[in-house]
From Swiss-Prot:
CDD domains: ASKHA_NBD_HK_plant. Fructose and glucose phosphorylating enzyme. May be involved in the phosphorylation of glucose during the export from mitochondrion to cytosol. Acts as a sugar sensor which may regulate sugar-dependent gene repression or activation. Mediates the effects of sugar on plant growth and development independently of its catalytic activity or the sugar metabolism. May regulate the execution of program cell death in plant cells. Promotes roots and leaves growth. This is Hexokinase-1. Residues 90-228 are annotated as: Hexokinase small subdomain. Pathway: Carbohydrate metabolism; hexose metabolism; Carbohydrate degradation; glycolysis; D-glyceraldehyde 3-phosphate and glycerone phosphate from D-glucose: step 1/4. InterPro entries: ATPase_NBD, Hexokinase, Hexokinase_BS, Hexokinase_C, Hexokinase_N. Interacts with RPT5B in nucleus. Interacts with RHIP1. Interacts with KING1 in mitochondria. Interacts with CLF (via SANT domain) and EZA1/SWN (via SANT domain) in nucleus. Disruption phenotype: Plants display a glucose-insensitive phenotype which allows them to grow on high glucose concentration medium (>6% glucose). Dwarf plants with reduced roots and leaves growth. The gene is HXK1. ADP binds at residues 104-106, 253, 441. Disulfide bonds: none annotated.
Length: 496
């Protein structure tokens, strides 16, 4: 063999070796990066763990905070607000009642005709009205005038089926889903606006007084019988159909719980004890925090960068507003530290809240062999054209970890309420039925979440006690609940 041929062979061999080394190095780098992805996944799973022992600690901490919040204002992270609702609907209510539900950029007006135990809700009608953006930041009178005018127009469409007896004033339940310091069943001052509203002159004002003045200005004769928040409304709606309902929980964009407490168990209540001996407490449980909550680095940074750092910690790990955002933050770390999506981080992945909880739910629910829905969601939301099956499996694992933690902590919260009420065990063979009325898009539409929550609650209660506890969906409880509370606190109860 000549020198040229030998030289060529050596060069070729060297080139092949170089390519082989490069391939091996890339494979090693790739396996190294994949190892980092799996390490991030494993650490996240461990930090989110909710063994039954931890859930019991969370439930016990919830019960302790409930006692503290009932003892004094400011004594707990749980506000434990007195709702002044001491007479929940029983099903006996009769007559025509109205509801106004204001909780965001739309409001609803509703009327219901109640026919007592036999007929229940005979008929109902509602209308949804959008609030023009300029009224959300304008003057208080302008906003309440707009609402009163819409209500007057709705009343004007009342047909003969909705009969109001002679000499009887129309009565309204007002669901107002903004922070309010309630001073009676039908009065409360606005603490602050949320959800894009910013009308400074209304802060500190009695919202019922503001609506009453607007009703007078438009010439509508209507008594506001009850001011309630959406969770108390859900409790009222649940109790109307089932006398065993003891609490209501909303799991939606946000989260909250309300329950029926013995009036004698509320040390901070200084008024006359209600005849019923009961009082509905609005817990504002989204603000619960405890050293027992399994918080991760992602939760801490999400909280730090939020508009209300240090507040609403439970809400930030269990509610629909935040679950998708937690997923985005973990994927971003995988992309930055382990090149999960390749050498460049998808620019869309850096946009906060771009992954919404409905997206996460759709991916988590993907049962196709190649996880096609996961691939298409990642493509549509993050503009990542292709993903491997093992990448999609990681995304599913993350969805499962985040949803499981949220669902199990929700169950621990409910268990804490049942413990406070002494309904977490069966006593002396006595079967005391306890029903929890649930509402909210997260509970209603995220199947894996709601199923995990219910199975975790059963696990906490044990076989015997879980037989006497039931979770039911109280669809749109807050809307009809306000009308039902107007009915149960009507001036005309005797007439009914």
């Amino acid at each position: 063999m000549g020198k040229v041929a030998v030289g060529a062979t050596v060069v070729c061999t060297a080139a092949v070796c170089a390519v082989a080394v490069l391939v091996v190095r890339r494979r090693m780098q790739s396996s190294g990066k994949w190892g980092r992805v799996l390490a991030i996944l494993k650490a996240f799973e461990e930090d989110c763990a909710t063994p039954i022992s931890k859930l019991r600690q969370v439930a016990d901490a919830m019960t302790v905070e409930m006692h503290a919040g009932l003892a004094s204002d400011g004594g707990s992270k749980l506000k434990m607000l007195i709702s002044y609702v001491d007479n929940l609907p029983s099903g006996d209510e009769k007559g025509l009642f109205y509801a106004l539900d204001l909780g965001g950029t739309n409001f609803r007006v509703m009327r219901v005709l109640l026919g007592g135990k036999q007929e229940r809700v005979v008929k109902q009608e509602f209308e949804e009205v959008s609030i023009p953006p300029h009224l959300m930041t304008g003057g208080s009178d302008e906003l309440f005038n707009f609402i009163a005018e819409a209500l007057a127009k709705f009343v004007a469409t009342e047909c003969e089926d909705f009969h109001l007896p002679e000499g009887r004033q129309r009565e309204l339940g007002f669901t107002f889903s903004f922070p309010v310091k309630q001073t009676s069943l039908s009065s409360g001052s606005l603490i602050k606006w949320t959800k894009g509203f910013s009308i400074e002159e209304a802060v500190g004002q009695d919202v019922v007084g503001a609506l009453n003045k607007a009703l007078e200005r438009v010439g509508l004769d209507m008594r506001i019988a009850a001011l309630v928040n959406d969770t108390v409304g859900t409790l009222a709606g649940g109790r109307y159909y089932n006398p065993d309902v003891v609490a209501a929980v909303i799991l939606g964009t946000g989260t909250n719980a309300a329950y029926v407490e013995r009036a004698t168990a509320i040390p901070k209540w200084h008024g006359l004890l209600p005849k019923s001996g009961e009082m509905v407490i609005n817990m504002e449980w989204g603000n619960f925090r405890s050293s027992h909550l399994p918080l991760t680095e992602f939760d801490h940074t999400l909280d730090f960068e939020s508009l209300n750092p240090g507040e609403q910690i439970l809400e930030k790990i269990i509610s629909g507003m935040y679950l998708g955002e937690i997923l985005r933050r973990v994927l971003l770390k995988m992309a930055e530290d382990a090149a999960f999506f390749g050498d460049t981080v998808p620019s869309k992945l850096r946009i906060p809240f771009i992954i919404r909880t409905p997206h996460m739910s759709a991916m988590h629910n993907d049962t196709s062999p190649d996880l096609k829905i996961v691939g298409s969601k990642i493509k549509d939301i993050l503009e990542v054209p292709t993903t491997s099956l093992k990448m999609r499996k990681v995304v599913i694992s993350l969805c499962n970890i985040i949803a499981t933690r949220g669902a199990r902590l929700s169950a621990a919260g409910i268990y804490g309420i049942l413990k406070k009420l002494g309904r977490d065990t069966t006593k002396d063979e006595e079967v005391q039925k306890s029903v929890i009325a649930m509402d909210g898009g997260l509970f209603e539409h995220y199947t894996q979440f709601s199923e995990c929550m219910e199975s975790s609650l059963k696990e906490l209660l044990g076989d015997e006690a879980s037989g006497s506890v039931e979770v039911t969906h109280s669809n749109d409880g807050s809307g009809i609940g306000a009308a039902l509370l107007a009915a149960s606190h009507s001036l005309y109860l005797e007439d009914s």
